[in-house]
Design a protein with these regions (language model features):
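Repeated loop/turn-to-beta-strand initiation elements of outer-membrane beta-barrel proteins
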Residues: 7-11, 64-69, 106-111, 143-149, ...
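Outer-membrane beta-barrel translocator domains and adjoining extracellular loop/strand segments
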Residues: 14, 22-33, 79-87, 121-128, ...
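Residues on the lipid-exposed face of transmembrane beta-strands in outer-membrane beta-barrel proteins
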Residues: 1-5, 54-60, 73, 96-102, ...
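Outer membrane beta-barrel strand-and-loop segments of large Gram-negative receptors
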Residues: 2-70, 84, 95
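C-terminal beta-signal and adjacent terminal beta-strands/loops
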Residues: 141-200
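Residues that define the transmembrane beta-barrel architecture of outer-membrane proteins
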Residues: 1, 48-52, 88-94, 129-133, ...
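Transmembrane beta-strands of outer-membrane beta-barrel pores
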Residues: 7, 16-20, 60-64, 73-79, ...
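C-terminal beta-barrel architecture of Gram-negative outer-membrane proteins
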Residues: 73-78, 90-142, 166
Length: 200
């Protein structure tokens, strides 16, 4: 079920999803008697899982500055006690995104985007707080602004990590990885026939 609505620069959405017999991958002891300490990763179905939440998007414009602020709340509850996975948390996970666009004089354009997702305990997993900041400065050239030169910086503070803790059948695993999205560079774009002139 989903519901969306908007008015001028305000948009909102709500959703609810119920999944039955959802497949999941989880860990359990392989054989405590013959092979103690050996963990087996396997798949099984969970009788009932629920995901629901909502989002609010604000996109006003103040002259040369156009921010877009997104605030969302997410819940996820998946009861895996039939698989002997005992934790059953249902904390809310807030997520905030601020995307700033600045249309500057003389063909300059600046975009700065930041995201912050707070940690939460949901179902039988624990998510850690994570966030990133990206920026791009663009200068347009030529009469029709067909040539664009951009200075790009992705994941400026190298914070784009993913930290995930998950419980299984008498097991506990912790994962952390870095997506290696940090980039600093120059981008060139040229749009042919930018004015859509059929004689060009």
């Amino acid at each position: 079920f989903s519901l969306e609505g908007g008015w001028k620069w305000i948009n909102a959405s709500l959703y609810f999803d119920h999944a039955r017999n959802m497949y999941t991958t989880y860990a359990k002891p392989y054989d405590d008697a013959k092979h103690p300490g050996v963990v087996l990763w396997t798949m099984a179905s969970i009788p009932n899982s629920y995901a629901y939440g909502g989002a609010l998007v604000l996109s006003p414009k103040f002259g040369w500055w156009q921010p877009q602020f997104t605030a969302s709340l997410f819940w996820f509850q998946s009861n895996a006690r039939s698989l002997n996975i005992q934790p059953l948390w249902n904390e809310v996970q807030p997520d905030f995104i601020l995307n700033n666009s600045f249309t500057l004089p003389r063909g300059w354009f600046l975009n700065i985007k930041g995201r912050l997702a707070f940690g939460a305990k949901q179902s039988y997993a624990i998510k850690k707080t994570e966030g990133t900041v990206d920026a791009q400065l663009t200068k347009s050239f030529l009469k029709d602004r067909a040539l664009r030169v951009s200075l790009v910086a992705n994941d400026i503070f190298r914070t784009g990590t993913y930290h995930f803790r998950v419980y299984g059948d008498r097991t506990y695993n912790e994962f952390e990885n870095y997506a290696d999205k940090q980039r600093f560079g120059i981008r060139l774009n040229y749009q042919f026939n930018a004015t859509k002139n059929k004689y060009k």
